[in-house]
């Protein structure tokens, strides 16, 4: 899906909210920000790689005898996850489109939350059976799901950090937790452009997340959980 993002004009930038103290402080802050930006330069590759690799790794293990992967249960879901993960990293590295990359990362997180809730629901249903305790102990989460969650968080966090750095560099503002939080809210409220229309980034994330959930609900894993 081709999409471009534009930050909301009405929201104050983090740079405006965090003014530098003295010229020497501003210069020192710029050095720290530039150093951090260099350190984060390759991080989106790591996040995207974690998301992509997760679809080939087990998410759930049944009695250590049968492993379930995204690739096995739904090719459509597998391709969608790979596309979103790669597109998010591309938006960060090539387009510097942090609104879009964060929105895609949030969509992956929405899917991760729903998948985990479904997993917990499965355990609750299994425990109600005659051999519930034994059966539920045989079902466990595997590295695939954790790798996916880590990759999605990586893409979201890096988007927030890099966008904050871009906002703070001109004035040499200091990087702080409250600034990062305000930047995150700004990214969520910003606009994502789809063709000729613009939608809030949170709405874009919700729609993409729902699409992933729908693919999951049609997958073999969900049928197996019933």
PLM feature spans:
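Cationic, low-complexity basic patches in intrinsically disordered or flexible, solvent-exposed regions
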Residues: 19-20
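Cys/His-rich metal-coordination motifs, chiefly Zn-binding "fingers/knuckles"
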Residues: 1-13
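Compact integral membrane and secretory-pathway proteins
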Residues: 23-226
